[in-house]
Amino acid sequence: QRYLPRVLALVIRVLIQTMQMLWTMSVALPRPTHVLLQTPPCVPSFAVCALVCFVRRAKFVIDWHNFAYTLMALKMGGRGSPLVRLAKIYEKMMGRLGHAHFAVTNAMATWLEEEWGIGGAVVLHDAPPDFFGPIDDETERIELLRRLQPALKVPTRLKVPNDSRDDATDTVYPPYTLWPREDQTTALVVSSTSWTPDEDFGILLDALILYDAVASKEQRGAFPRSYDILYPNLLVVVTGKGPQRAHYESRMKHLKLNRVVLRTAWLESEDYPKLLGVSDLGVCLHTSSSGLDLPMKVYDMFGCGLPVLAARYDVIHELVREDTRFAGGSVGVRGGVRLPEGGRKGKARDVGANGCLFSSPAEMAAQLCGLLRGFTIGQSEAQAMRGGLVEAPRRRWKQNWEEIALPVFT
């Protein structure tokens, strides 16, 4: 791509991938009974797999996780682009060649049948593998946090001058303590993002600015004990790589926050589930290019007993059972919190609720305040919700595969 025009480079890349796939599937591998293709991507894999299945008399099974043309539309200026329309036709035609289909949501299975005439799709929801689970052992938790602390560069205490006078006393904010739990002043919030246009990271930044205004407003003087504060400090760890990461990291450097620390990290594969296992709250900014898929990261968070704040879109209700007490709240720029009546009057949590859904930074900030209020004394809604998730039976991927997917191949 450094030496050729973009379109020509893409054509050459597709041709090379086509030859590699044809060789591997037609010559290098023995004749299969089934070919399972997860999509997207679909170019050139759709056409190659369909051809190989025809020649070698194998069954073509398509695992629909999203639609490639909708992802292309994010980069090509919308679904009206001629190239996007062509990609949609290709995906539809190739999809109809499948002998069996999996869909990740009920809504996607319905859409495939109604819009593309692809019926009989088996709904196969994602589920976390067994190694995603809560870490409640305090020794293991402390060991992990201490090991990650140098990479995250967590401060121990923040001081903010009250004003410009030389004799002014600094405002000393609570220390950033993550252990032991009984003296914990800091809630660990984790978000995994691909740093792409379908995940608006700016919403999280704006919400944290509003939360910081609320938490900073309540502080007056020193806080020698954790239970002197109503709202905890936040250590927000954002994992993942992607094209927009540098842009948002630049913006993060210019934030002046008193009670919130933001860190980006790329973790080893074995550390990511452990980080989820010791965290207090998860955030998902995924909104789906098609509006029909669900974020795998939320399944992983639930597998670790982690309540989630997720961006609101049509099918997210298939995964996140919303605590409606905090829906529609807001936070003003001066730190004023407005919660719905149910959130203000201590209404009981909705049965089975495992998170909240937000549509704006102000609503997300209000949910952070509502869920984390009382965190330092162990009486927050987030902690109660996490306890319920940890105790609830968790469906795992192995069970999903054996009960739902395997019969398609037998």
State what each model feature region is.
Residues 44-47, 51-55, 62, 68, ...:
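Membrane-proximal helix-turn-helix segments that form the acceptor-binding/catalytic region
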Residues 23-45, 58-61:
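Short N-terminal targeting/anchoring amphipathic segment
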Residues 102-103, 108-162:
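Helix-loop-beta element that forms the nucleotide-linked donor phosphate-binding surface
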Residues 357-369, 373-410:
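A charged, aromatic-enriched C-terminal amphipathic alpha-helix characteristic of glycosyltransferases
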Residues 148-163, 171-199, 205-209, 237:
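Conserved donor-binding/catalytic core segment of Leloir-type glycosyltransferases
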Residues 194-225, 246:
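A conserved mid-protein helix/loop that constitutes part of the nucleotide-sugar donor-binding site
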Residues 199, 268-275, 280-302, 310-318, ...:
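Nucleotide-sugar-dependent
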Residues 227-233, 237-240, 245-274, 330, ...:
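Nucleotide-activated donor-binding/catalytic signature segment of Leloir-type glycosyltransferases, i.e.
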